[in-house]
A protein has these predicted regions:
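RNase H-like nuclease fold core
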Residues: 2-95, 100-108, 112
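Alpha-helix initiation and N-capping motif
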Residues: 5, 117-121, 232, 236, ...
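Short hydrophobic/aromatic residue motifs in ordered secondary structure
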Residues: 43, 100, 122, 239-240
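Short helix/loop capping segments that flank catalytic or ligand/cofactor-binding pockets
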Residues: 47, 65, 103-104, 125-126, ...
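Conserved beta-strand -> loop -> alpha-helix junction used to position metal-binding or nucleic-acid-contacting
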Residues: 93-148
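Acidic/histidine-rich catalytic cores and adjacent linkers
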Residues: 99, 144-282
Length: 282
């Protein structure tokens, strides 16, 4: 007799719960061996409500280490989620996007921090494109006393993008020089929009202060000489293949447990070889 939909559902949930237990056992046995932890977040619907799924991976091996549901993406919430995992595994480096909350988490946990270059490049390219368009089409007035010009700003935007993309050996000093050039750009008055000079002041200062997080991979080496590639692509791929791919065929989840069970089941099977015994999941 064919299985009913409810029987299939129950079997998948039970297998997912078992996959979570197996993964937790596997992670416990890797204490001290996972030096670089990638984290990222995605959103799915549960009974029509937005639900945040947090995902942690081993950047060097590509293994999915944890799936969890969190209330928000604040530093406090993320730190509460990831602290125990980092301590248990003795993680050295956190790899993530460039959200301020994640910088705080890395600092609070005493971890080295690598920002995802792909994510940063996209964000910086968009910001520079917007500033460049404004400077070309409807530039703000440039105060005479600043010693700056629109042409100078356009040149500096190009230089900034080249620094962020190319990560030259003297990137820190180049960024410091740019940040110094715009440090006198005045902040906007109440209810006014920030000028293009002030926006570039913030942008150059931000990357001057966070250069080490962007270029960390150039110097970091694992215990056995492992290298980072400077991206969080591993975690993004896990989200795409283990969380989002299944979600696309559904109209949403009904329970938080279902989100974790299904993602964990797919994630666990994805880590196994072609001869894996599925009987482990029964």
């Amino acid at each position: 007799h064919p299985l009913s939909k409810s029987a299939v559902y129950n079997n998948v949930q039970a297998a997912g719960a078992q996959a979570i237990r197996l993964r937790q056992q596997w992670v416990t046995g890797r204490a001290g061996t996972i030096q670089a932890l990638g984290i990222d977040f995605t959103h799915v619907k549960r009974l029509g409500q937005d639900t945040i799924v947090a995902v942690a991976t081993s950047i060097l091996s590509g293994a999915a280490l944890d799936f969890d549901i969190i209330d928000d993406e604040s530093a406090e919430t993320i730190q509460a989620w990831v602290r125990e995992l980092c301590e248990r595994l003795q993680v050295e480096v956190l790899v993530s996007d460039d959200a301020d909350a994640l910088k705080t988490v890395a600092d609070e946990l005493g971890l080295e921090h690598q920002l995802c270059r792909a994510h940063v490049n996209r964000n910086v390219h968009a910001l520079i494109g917007a500033l460049g368009t404004q400077a070309l089409e409807h530039p703000d007035p440039v105060p005479d006393r600043s010693g700056l010009t629109v042409a100078q700003l356009l040149d500096d935007l190009q230089q900034l993008e080249e620094i962020i993309k190319g990560l030259p050996y003297d990137g820190q000093s180049q960024l410091d020089h740019l940040a110094e050039r715009y440090q006198t750009a005045p902040p906007p008055s109440a209810m006014a929009k920030a000028s293009m000079l002030y926006r570039l002041r913030l942008l150059t200062l931000d990357w001057s202060e966070n250069w080490s997080r962007l270029a960390r991979f150039q110097h970091w080496r694992g215990t056995h000489g492992e290298r980072l590639d400077g991206t969080n692509n591993v975690t993004e791929q896990i989200i795409g293949q283990r969380v989002k791919e299944r979600y696309r065929t559904m109209r949403g989840y009904k329970r938080d447990a279902s989100i974790l069970n299904v993602s964990s089941l797919i994630g666990w099977i994805g880590m196994q070889g072609p001869d894996y015994n599925l009987g482990e999941l029964i």
